[in-house]
């Protein structure tokens, strides 16, 4: 009977394919991909919804977007009278169409919607929510995912992504909508009056905040190459740099045009060195010093440096975090009660740097919304000077409550320009940080373990560390095991336990005098990540051996 219902359901979807907006994507998919759309459901989680285009409740299409919008409309109307919302969207396939669908549904429920007439960055959305004092915000993006993906992120009135509790409540409203094919969305001219143009003054205010944060960029002969990887950071980043009287940059022209197919890159991800290939070519031709790339929605960025011999140094997220923290410490020396926030899987290097400079630090779960929650809870006397995640997400000043590559681009250029005046580079500065606080190094291993056996192995690895924690790993003596699922720390050296004041998450962190390793399974994919952050000789060899020991 269940198979018959699934077949009927599939037939109903195919009958509506012409109205779905995604017929072309569906027809390009394999039989397995098509079937997955009918055998699964999109779920609204803590980061919203992200998925492939296609037919069925497990795919993004006109009908599943209408379901999401209707659930959010009911959620917002249950939270407050006369709710307001701002919607932004990136350059991906169907981002504009999804934005209009959501705006129409929300307007149909007397929710005032601010909708721009062009694509915007994710940090601009966070800022706009705060600037316009709206009840919520929606960002339509799938970050650096492949071209056949899109997603919806929902933000609260503070400009941060919804908290875990708010996400769960919104998810219930969405699920209560039921079958997306049965939704009837009447559009009336009276209701479309709730859709308002997005005020240009908001963008101007955002730019002013960054200009005030930067002040000026000192004159040097620093040359920069910038690429948006076909995303949203052009034109806003070039306009911002020019407003700061910095014109010594070249754009990778082929990659600075919006392109939902990301035609010129294998991966539109600044973590991936291949994303810099065209930037490196241009840097070699123009003898540039600094290379910067942002991901498609401009919340994350990567940097590389070219020396006089044409050698390229790529910086990982933890190294960029250390450089930016170091610079912010220099910039804020007059402030008292300074605070840095980072995720629990980010480097020991930044914590050591904070301690050395008498800067308080706090660690939170992975996900920038947890950083935003920490910012919201700051005392009046505390000064947050920097926040970051090792996955290339950074925030210098909290007028935005999400990762913000747009404000970081001129900051890193200013830093590099100052160093250039003294004949130094970012690589030199990183080496100085190592000499000051020790050579803490970091790496990440990501394992995909498919199917039932893969899931079983992931569970077995996590269970082993919970029930039978090792006394030492590769000659490193284990001090403590932090289990964020049980909210407990087991101190092996004292044979005692203590509590972790944090939301629950399936993460285990093993602490040594030399640093830590962390294990973090994905909640949505058959993946598990191993983070290694240590100060020890032969780091690469030790990290490889730890990885082999755990996953052999």
UniProtKB/Swiss-Prot annotation:
InterPro entries the UniProt entry points to: A-D-PHexomutase_a/b/a-I, A-D-PHexomutase_a/b/a-I/II/III, A-D-PHexomutase_a/b/a-II, A-D-PHexomutase_a/b/a-III, A-D-PHexomutase_C, A-D-PHexomutase_C_sf, A-D-PHexomutase_CS, Alpha-D-phosphohexomutase_SF
Positions of the catalytic residues: 143 (phosphoserine intermediate)
Residues reported to bind Mg(2+): 143, 295, 297, 299
EC number in record: 5.4.2.2
Short name of one Pfam family: PGM_PMM_IV
UniProt family annotation: Belongs to the phosphohexose mutase family.
Function: Catalyzes the interconversion between glucose-6-phosphate and alpha-glucose-1-phosphate. This is the first step in the biosynthesis of diglucosyl-diacylglycerol (Glc2-DAG), i.e. the predominant glycolipid found in the S.aureus membrane, which is also used as a membrane anchor for lipoteichoic acid (LTA).
UniProt name for this protein: Phosphoglucomutase
Organism expressing this protein natively: Staphylococcus aureus (strain NCTC 8325 / PS 47)
